[in-house]
Swiss-Prot record:
Location of this chain's protein in the cell: Mitochondrion
Source organism: Acanthamoeba castellanii (Amoeba)
Keyword presence, Ribosomal protein: yes
Protein name: Large ribosomal subunit protein uL5m
Keywords: Mitochondrion, Ribonucleoprotein, Ribosomal protein
Record flagged with keyword Transport: no
Main location: mitochondrion
Family: Belongs to the universal ribosomal protein uL5 family.
A Gene Ontology term for the protein's cellular component: mitochondrion
Length: 177
């Protein structure tokens, strides 16, 4: 339990370090971000610690997410195997969201298999993917702990390229295969 508390506080401190620098809306883009993730749980996991951790990270970044969908997948109706969560983010704090993404990316950079942020573009939306995040806990299991976080940003046609340039300065981005 002590490890879990230390992990939470270090993550909180890291994400809070310069959260206000994106409060000014320099791009003038009314973003409508939707964030979704699929988490594989630990072997034998029966609680929903990851939902709490995931939402805590969003609250720290001042997003106050609205949960759209939570879906669970069980093994033999008892052991939680994975869950899917989808949230709508606060439009007023859209640039806090970019700071959240940047800090989250930097924090977990050393445990990525692909050290980049992947993206796809569909009509008026830009979809970003962070793949293969590994979380460090006591019973860390490398094979069971891969996850993907997907962020969808709905934009007007002309704004997708501006946003892409902006994000490209923050992350190493490549097209998802």
């Amino acid at each position: 339990m002590r490890f879990y508390n230390r992990y939470n506080s270090s993550l909180k401190n890291y994400l809070l370090c310069s959260i206000n620098s994106f409060n000014t809306n320099t791009l003038k883009i009314p973003l409508k971000p939707t964030l979704s993730a699929v988490f594989n749980t630990f072997r034998g996991e029966r609680s929903l610690k990851f939902i709490k951790l995931y939402l805590m990270i969003l609250y720290i970044s001042n997003q106050k997410p609205f949960i759209k969908k939570v879906k669970f997948s069980y093994i033999k109706k008892k052991i939680l195997k994975r869950f899917f969560i989808s949230v709508s983010l606060n439009k007023k704090n859209s640039f806090n969201f970019f700071m959240y993404m940047l800090n989250f990316y930097n924090y977990f950079f050393h445990i990525y298999y692909q050290k980049c942020l992947k993206y796809n573009r569909f009509e008026n939306s830009l979809i970003l993917y962070i793949d293969n995040i590994q979380f460090f806990f006591k019973n860390y299991n490398k094979q069971n702990q891969k996850t993907q976080i997907k962020c969808q940003l709905n934009l007007r046609n002309s704004q997708a390229s501006i946003l892409f340039k902006y994000l490209n300065n923050m992350f190493l981005i490549k097209v998802k295969n």
